[in-house]
């Protein structure tokens, strides 16, 4: 969270909104956008975004070491393909990543 504040992606006075009693940040779409922007601004040559992050899935997609307890490779997304393609979220993520990558290129 401090890195997001340092990059100007999260206001310092809002840090408390994202902290839980367990010390693990509470995920919100706003926090997710800040994280995507932060990653896109990195100097990494490759950046990938999981479709689960685009559609806002909160359950972990793959739990290593499980077989029958967790259907790792049979999970369905909560949105269908049309909702993903024609919804606003995919274009928002593409915009955040494009803007971040352009900033990274200028560094």
What are these regions (language model features)?
Residues 1-107:
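Catalytic cores of glycan-processing enzymes that make or break glycosidic bonds
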